Amino acid sequence: MTAVLLWGFKMNNKDELLRRFLRYVAITSQSNASVESVPSTKGQTELANLLAKDLEELGLTDISVDEHSIVYGTLHGNAEGPVVGFVSHLDTVDVSLNPDIHPQVIHYEGGDVLLNKEREIYI
């Protein structure tokens, strides 16, 4: 049985971790430079609310999402030591990408990775 550690919580298989990750990346969270408010798109709020729900399921406390879609939560430690904070952003840069997202898992074995066959885009 495979065990994956996510935020200090043991998950019984890597498929659950992958499932969560694919749910996150499937949400259109591109920023909109023409909007002056934060968040600039509904997708950013959707992702923040999903993350808050998942953090609660993982056992974190004091979870909240503020008016700017900033997610807060507390994971209590089990030993004395300094407090650690994690900071990240939910949006992706709007570079006129298609908001219709189709995440894929590629088992990399070296060489170029084909991203778009029609446009011949590789990384």
Language model segments and positions:
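Short, well-structured beta-strand/strand-turn elements
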Residues: 61-69
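Active-site metal-coordination/substrate-binding segment of hydrolases
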Residues: 81-123
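Short beta-strand-to-loop junctions in surface cap/lid or active-site-entrance loops
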Residues: 73-80
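N-terminal capping segment at the start of a domain
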Residues: 14-42
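Short, Lys/Arg-enriched N-terminal segments with co-localized hydrophobic residues
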Residues: 1-10
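Short catalytic helix/loop segments, enriched in acidic residues and glycine
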Residues: 43-52
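Conserved dinucleotide-binding and phosphotransfer motif residues
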Residues: 58
